[in-house]
Design a protein with these regions (language model features):
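Surface-exposed patches in mature extracellular/periplasmic domains of secreted proteins
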Residues: 65-74
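Sec-dependent bacterial lipoprotein signal peptides
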Residues: 1-17
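Bacterial lipoprotein signal-peptidase II cleavage site
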Residues: 19-30
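N-terminal low-complexity, Pro/Thr/Ser-rich intrinsically disordered segments
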Residues: 29-49
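Amphipathic alpha-helical segments
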Residues: 49-65
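Short Gly/Thr-rich strand-loop-strand
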Residues: 4, 104-138
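Extracellularly exposed regions in secreted/surface proteins, prominently low-complexity, repeat-rich
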Residues: 135, 142-173
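A short acidic-to-branched-hydrophobic micro-motif
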Residues: 78-105, 147-152
Length: 173
């Protein structure tokens, strides 16, 4: 389990422990800790994940029509870009790109290897395809310390389209 997974487990444990009805209050100087002493700081700033793929590249590779990118950031998980159908109608995103800068190239490769999917050759330093939870498709890739996940649950987006976009994206890292 990686540091972010331990953090999530620690938060859940802390929340459940808070339901125990104890009247004691924690020391105001006590710092929260994660299991095994892991400290998870904020994700290193990757910048805007939407800079990695243009809307026209996503549209061309997926053949789902015009898309509109929307950027967001999570302090623990990095930068996201969600490409949605420009015409509306479907609430299902066409593609989501998550990008984060890990503390080292080895850490980024380890994140890719955790996906367990088949290796994709010629894409970044390390890349794997997967079907997370059996829903949709994803490509996990690393180049240097950058770790990127391209994923889609849209019915018209193929694994081949994600792999093509991953190759384009890796060339920009």
């Amino acid at each position: 389990m990686d540091a972010r997974g331990w953090l999530a487990a620690g938060v859940l444990t802390g929340a459940l422990a808070g339901c125990g009805g104890s009247t004691s209050t924690p020391s105001p100087t006590a710092a929260p800790s994660t299991p095994q002493g892991l400290v998870v700081g904020p994700a290193r700033d990757f910048g805007d994940a939407c800079r990695l793929l243009t809307a026209s590249e996503v549209q061309s590779a997926t053949s789902v029509g015009p898309v509109t990118p929307g950027s967001s950031k999570d302090p623990q998980l990095g930068s996201y870009c969600t490409y949605r159908p420009a015409a509306g109608g479907s609430s299902v995103p066409v593609l989501t790109v998550q990008a984060v800068t890990e503390y080292s190239a080895a850490a980024a490769r380890a994140m890719v290897d955790q996906s367990g999917g088949p290796t994709l050759s010629g894409v970044g330093d390390d890349a794997r395809a997967a079907k997370p939870g059996g829903l949709g498709s994803a490509v996990y890739l690393s180049k240097g310390a950058s770790y990127v996940v391209l994923s889609s649950i849209h019915k018209d987006v193929t694994e081949q389209a994600l792999e093509k976009l991953a190759g384009t994206l890796a060339g920009r890292l």
